Amino acid sequence: MQLNSTEISELIKKRIAQFDVVSEAQSTGTIVSVSDGIIRIHGLADVMQGEMIELPGNRYAIALNLERDSVGAVVMGPYADLAEGMSVKCTGRILEVPVGRGLLGRVVNTLGQPIDGKGEIDNDGFSPVEVIAPGVIDRQSVDQPVQTGYKAVDSMVPIGRGQRELIIGDRQTGKTALAIDAIIAQKDSGIKCIYVAIGQKASTIANVVRKLEEHGALANTIVVVASASESAALQYLAPYSGCAMGEYFRDRGEDALIVYDDLSKQAVAYRQISLLLRRPPGREAFPGDVFYLHSRLLERAARVSADYVESFTNGAVKGQTGSLTALPIIETQAGDVSAFVPTNVISITDGQIFLESSLFNSGIRPAVNPGISVSRVGSAAQTKAIKKLSGGIRTALAQYRELAAFAQFASDLDDATRKQLSHGQKVTELLKQKQFAPMPVSEQALVLFAAEFGYLDDVELERIGSFESALLAYANSNHTDFMKNLAKSGDYNDSIKDQLKAIVEDFKKNGAW
C-alpha cells in the first residue's frame, strides 16, 4: 500500500498534534572530589543551604557550604563508591522525616527508616528536621510536673513540662540510667518519649531498647539511633530528627519528653564535618556556630499555648496546651564543667543535674550533687506534696556537707552539730535509689515526710534502706486507696498530713524492719 503526499502530510500533522512535550528544568552538577563523607560539587548554581542533593544509587547529600565556584555537601550514608565526574542534581527540598503515632514502639535511624525488623512504619506524614522554634507569644509558662521517679531529682531539682534540664557529668556516672528511668516513669503518665542515641555502641543501644521493653515503656517511646558506626552527618542530624518527631505531639496539644544522649558526641560530629569542609576552627577546634548548633535545637523544647495548638490544628484541638520537655546529656572530662560545650549548653538550658563520679563511686546513686544542681523553672511545676515536704532536704544536705568538711578537723563536736551530721547522713542514705525502680509521688511523699518530721532520728544509718522498703510495703498494703489517690492528685493539706503521720506512727509501733 502506497501513501500519497497528502495522506503523509495529514499523518505527520496528526502525530504532531498528539505529541505532548513537558520541559523539565533541572539544576545538575558534577562531583569534583570525594573525601571522608564530604563531596565537592561543581555546578548547582541554584542550590539552597541545607537542600538535599540527589546522588547516584538513590542516596542524598546535604548542601552545607555554598562557595563561589563549588558546593560542599555531606553524604548521608555510604560514600565509598562515589567518584569524581559523577552527575548529581538538586531536589528543591530540605530533609524531612516521617512523624506520627506509628513511630511509637519503634527503633528508627536518623532518616526515620525502621531498623528493628518489625516492618514498615505507618506514619501520619513528614516534617522538616529544621524548624524555627515557637516565638515568645506562642509559649506558656511551665507549671505542670514531669515526674522522673527519683526522690533526689523530684524533690531538689524538679522538672516541668516544656523545660530543658541538662544532665551533666563524667563518663560512668549514671547519666543514661537517670534518663532511661525518667522515660520508664512516664509509661502511665500520658507523656510520649523520644530517646535519641548519638555516637553510642550498637550493643549499648540494644540493651537500652531491651530494658525499655522489659519495663513496658517501649510502646510509649520512639528510639532514634545514630550509632558510632554511622557517618558524622547522621550523628549531627539525629537530634533534629528526634525533635521533629517530638514536635508532632507538642503541636497537637500533647506532652512529649525527649532525651539527647549525648550532645557532646553531636558537637564532635559537627566539628568533624566543619573541619572537613574547611570552615575556620575556633576554641577547642569547634566551629564558630557550635553554640547555634545546640541553641536552635533546645529552643524547640517549649510549652506552647492553647491558641498555638488550635491555630496549628486548624481548630481540631481546642483548649489544650502542648509541651516538649528536653533532657540533653553532656559528658564532661574530669568534672570540668567550664569547657566550651558544657558552658554553652548550661547557658541555654533551664537548669542542670550535675552527677559526680566521687559520689557515684562512694555508692550514692543517683550521684546528684545538690550543691550545683539547679532547676530554674521547675519549682513552679512541682507537685504540692513534694514541694511542701522537700523544703528541708536541700538545707539538711547543704548543712551536712559543710559540717562534714569541718568535722574532719574538729576533735569534739557539740550535740547540735552531731545531730545535724546524723540527720544529713540519713537523708543522703534515704535519697539513694536503685535503677529501674521509679517511685510514684505517694511513695516519695511518705518517705520525705518521715525524713522531714524526724521519724528517722532513732533509726540506725545501716537500717535506713530496710526501713524505707518496709514502710512503703506497709503503706501500699494497708492504705492502698490513700496511696493511689495521693499518687494521682499529688496534693498536700492538713488531712493528708495527718494521714501520713498516722501511717508512719502505726508502722513504727508495729513494723519490723
UniProtKB/Swiss-Prot annotation:
Keyword Nucleotide-binding among UniProt keywords: yes
Subunit comment: F-type ATPases have 2 components, CF(1) - the catalytic core - and CF(0) - the membrane proton channel. CF(1) has five subunits: alpha(3), beta(3), gamma(1), delta(1), epsilon(1). CF(0) has three main subunits: a(1), b(2) and c(9-12). The alpha and beta chains form an alternating ring which encloses part of the gamma chain. CF(1) is attached to CF(0) by a central stalk formed by the gamma and epsilon chains, while a peripheral stalk is formed by the delta and b chains.
Molecular function GO terms recorded: ADP binding; ATP binding; proton-transporting ATP synthase activity, rotational mechanism
Domain of life: Bacteria
EC number(s) on file: 7.1.2.2
Primary subcellular site in the record, as a coarse category: membrane
PANTHER family: ATP SYNTHASE SUBUNIT ALPHA, MITOCHONDRIAL
GO CC annotations, alphabetized: plasma membrane; proton-transporting ATP synthase complex
Protein species of origin: Actinobacillus pleuropneumoniae serotype 7 (strain AP76)
Family: Belongs to the ATPase alpha/beta chains family.
Localisation: Cell inner membrane
Positions with a binding annotation for ATP: G169, D170, R171, Q172, T173, G174, K175, T176
Keyword hit for Translocase: yes
Entry-linked InterPro entries: ATP_synth_asu-like_sf (IPR023366), ATP_synth_asu_C (IPR000793), ATP_synth_asu_C_sf (IPR038376), ATP_synth_F1_a_nt-bd_dom (IPR033732), ATP_synth_F1_asu (IPR005294), ATPase_a/bsu_AS (IPR020003), ATPase_F1/V1/A1_a/bsu_N (IPR004100), ATPase_F1/V1/A1_a/bsu_N_sf (IPR036121)
UniProt cross-references to Pfam families, sorted A to Z: ATP-synt_ab (PF00006), ATP-synt_ab_C (PF00306), ATP-synt_ab_N (PF02874)
Membrane topology field: Peripheral membrane protein
PROSITE patterns: ATPASE_ALPHA_BETA (PS00152)
Name of this protein: ATP synthase subunit alpha
